[in-house]
Amino acid sequence: MTDLHLWLIPLVPVAGFLVNGLFGRRFPKALVTAVAIVAAAVPMLQVASIVYRFSSLTRPFIESHGTWIAAGAFHASFAFQLDQLSMVMLCVVTGVGFLIHVYSIGYMGEEEGYWRFFAYMNLFLFFMLTLVLSANFLLMFVGWEGVGLASYLLIGFYYTRDSASNAGKKAFLYNRVGDVGFLLAMFLLIAHFGTLNFSDVFGAIGSNPAMHGGILTAIGLLLLLGAVGKSAQIPLYVWLPDAMEGPTPVSALIHAATMVTAGVYMIARAHIIYDRSAIALLTVASIGTATALLAATMGMMQNDIKRVLAYSTVSQLGYMFLGCGVAAYSAGVFHLVTHAFFKALLFLAAGSVIHTLGGEQDMRAMGGLRTKIPVTFWTMTAAVFAISGFPPLCGFVSKDEILYQAFVHSEAGKVFWAVGLLTAGLTSFYMFRLWYMTFFGESRAVAYEEAAVHARHDTKLTLEAEHAHHVHESPKSMLVPMTILAILCVIAGGLGWPEGLGGTNWFSHFLAPAVSGAHLQYEPVRVALATGGIGASATNQAPAPANNLEIILAIVSTLVALSGWCAAHLMYYKRRDLPARLTARFHAIYSLVFNKYWVDEIYGALVVAPVLFIARWVLAALVDRGVIDGGGLLAGCTAQGFGSLAARIQSGNIRSYAGWLAAFAALLLVAVYFGWTTHFGIR
């Protein structure tokens, strides 16, 4: 297996970035497009070839390209790793990434920064592929920081808008908070294991069954902090909704399908650490469950179509954390895959709607589009049913597997199951709310005059021009990727159809070598909290009880999803006056949720304002202007004073020189007489 040349996979996208980044401004648009698409297509073909040939790996394949850092006893190699987990991530990143690159040809076709957009997209692919291929935590961190940089650049793509620039800075800073945890975890790994290589760290843990708790809990919680920042979980989730200021293809690729799932990938990659710490697992599951529910309630009240999907993304990432937190890593990763399909499709379909309406994103100004843009309608319908959890679509399979694994995991897991089930109902409600408001009823564009005629990609329309705007279907470059993703939403669930429902759960068996630790001769240690909580059985996949239980839970979940659909149908199709009446009746609750629980305002008062105060009045006013500027001014004045004195001495008058010499001679004689010179070692 020496012919894999894994380093070539991220090489092509970075070449595309360099070519378009350096010369794209002078290239014709067709050449920019060709460079970007080739840079996305070649890695996809490379990955397809590798997966076809090496999907049956029983041990990770590590491809080292020499020592990268050597500092004393610590050595870090520039190495890539291939196993089933990295294969899954490679397929998602390159496959969905290629489709979104194709979609962007039509969506971004009229943009002035067309070349810059594709350069940044290729740069993101390079760093994301580096992240998932890395064989050690240090190289993973390089990719981790790189995707954050690409995210910042693409969120702020419309840099002339203050909202986009501020959103980019917000995302960058919140992610840096999480990255502190990642860095501290690496320091602990070096201090305790002397290495950052996955194989060495996990091998050391696997060979020592007595090692659990303590240091592993600390490392697991610090890694979790990094994952929480990157994957937008409580308390660092607030950057993701604002990230919708970027172009819609960016929202689909980076802030839905790939980058935001990096935290889930890291937890699955480090599963051996989490399996040895019940506290770390409990924390992962608790954060995921709480985030899923909180974000779902926020999504119910949003009117911007992209922000609804943003909160939905935060919520679905919470499901993935829940899956990993109950040690059902295969289920969590499978939901990562299916989510990439249906959430990317939802964003692309939303982009098609926005493109059709000349930049409109407010759902209150939409309606009646299902007959005017039928391909967009039917593809988005597939995604809505998938995320809502209706069988046999992929979202039903992956989400229900997580809920089932939580239910059978422990007593605490049943609490997580109940909250996850409630979240599923809310998800169905707000997704069908989006569906009805966007595609059904009459067009509300004229009636909704206060809806800003805002444009998301430099399209400035007057109200009259917008009303006259010809509603038409998007170009084929946008519709073909959407259609492919819709097909995947329908059929991908078969890959992980549970055995308890009559399937083979092929995906779980495929991923098992990478998340079971079998190649390390490793068996998860059964650790339990004193309360008999979540750690009762920290196995990678909970044992399956009788099939009847899984069937019953699947039926319950489907009924809950159906109830959410029925509620949305009643409120946004049958009786459209109900939302306004309920809002008036429960105004306090509505205001709380509509304002997102004022979390941003609380952070602003408790964190941002004190930091700005310290920066402006302590660091800037006192330290910068007082100490640094004042010290510099004092030094300058002192030097100027000595210079003036020296200038007076250097007068050119011989009598003046004689006077100064006489004065200094007298001073020297006095010093000798009183013995002052002995204090300075002068004899």
Name the predicted role of every residue range.
Residues 1-5, 11, 22-119, 191-212, ...:
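Transmembrane helix-loop-helix hairpins at membrane boundaries of multipass inner-membrane proteins
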Residues 1-11, 27-34, 74-92, 130-143, ...:
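Membrane-entry segments of alpha-helical transmembrane domains in multi-pass membrane proteins
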Residues 21, 25, 44-58, 98, ...:
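Transmembrane helix-loop junctions and nearby membrane-interface residues
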Residues 29-42, 169-179, 371-380, 472-487, ...:
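Alpha-helical transmembrane segments and their helix-start/interface "positive-inside/aromatic belt" motifs
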Residues 38-54, 178-188, 380-388, 481-506, ...:
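Hydrophobic alpha-helical membrane-insertion segments
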Residues 44, 343, 425-437, 560-580:
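Hydrophobic alpha-helical membrane-embedded segments
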Residues 72-75, 81-84, 498-559, 569-683:
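Aromatic-capped, Gly/Pro-kinked transmembrane alpha-helices
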Residues 99-143, 149-470, 494:
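Hydrophobic transmembrane alpha-helices and their helix-loop junctions in integral membrane proteins
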